[in-house]
Amino acid sequence: MARGEQQRGEGGQRRDRRDRNAPEERVDSDIVEKLVHINRVAATVKGGRRFSFAALMVVGDQKGRVGFGHGKAREVPEAIRKATEEAKKTMIRVPLRESRTLHHDGAGRWGAGKVMMRAAPPGTGVIAGGPMRAVLETLGVQDVVAKSTGSSNPYNMVRATFEALKVQSSPRQIAAKRGKKVGDILGRRADGASAPEAIEG
């Protein structure tokens, strides 16, 4: 706890505004690590039950790259280490609009978990709960409105969030794919937030 308080103090005003109930956060060089969930797992073996811990971690550079990992071990620190290593190996790049929000609205699903995300104007903040907030903040999103329905399982919510992020496309990417100019794509985004053309592409 002391370490977290020290990081908030060194991080300045921006960190002071973060939700105190947010997942535990660690900073490793340029990579931010967040422990989303940890639970104890029991396996029945000959002679009794064997207990271990499963950790779900999210890592990112807060500049458009993010990944998640799941690790299991008999001790909590080892489970976190394994999950962190896996998360760093599976990082994806997501284009961000103005380095602060999504380029267009999106939705994702994994198992019984469903998420919906909407780009938002400056000053909105990250309006999302639990696992979704961890992913979006670690990615570097500063303004977004997100909602989850269905399963509240942290793993399903994280996977659903990643599925929604994978379909994000910048105007440049869409223009290249369709053989058009960037201006043609931007001209169809008069509302500045939602881009149906982008979602379809």
Swiss-Prot record:
Keywords: Ribonucleoprotein, Ribosomal protein, RNA-binding, rRNA-binding
Basic and acidic residues biased stretches: 181-191
Domain S5 DRBM: 31-94
Pfam family, one: Ribosomal_S5
Molecular functions per Gene Ontology: rRNA binding; structural constituent of ribosome
The UniProt record lists the keyword Glycosyltransferase: no
One GO cellular component term noted in the UniProt record for this chain: small ribosomal subunit
Chain intervals for the UniProt region annotation (Disordered): 1-28, 173-201
InterPro entries found in the cross-reference section: Ribosomal_Su5_D2-typ_SF, Ribosomal_uS5, Ribosomal_uS5_bac-type, Ribosomal_uS5_C, Ribosomal_uS5_N, Ribosomal_uS5_N_CS, Ribsml_uS5_D2-typ_fold_subgr
Biological process terms in GO annotation: translation
Domain notes: The N-terminal domain interacts with the head of the 30S subunit; the C-terminal domain interacts with the body and contacts protein S4. The interaction surface between S4 and S5 is involved in control of translational fidelity.
UniProt subunit comment: Part of the 30S ribosomal subunit. Contacts proteins S4 and S8.
Record function comment: With S4 and S12 plays an important role in translational accuracy.
Family of this protein: Belongs to the universal ribosomal protein uS5 family.
Name of protein: Small ribosomal subunit protein uS5
Highest classification ranks of the organism: Bacteria, Pseudomonadati, Pseudomonadota, Alphaproteobacteria, Caulobacterales
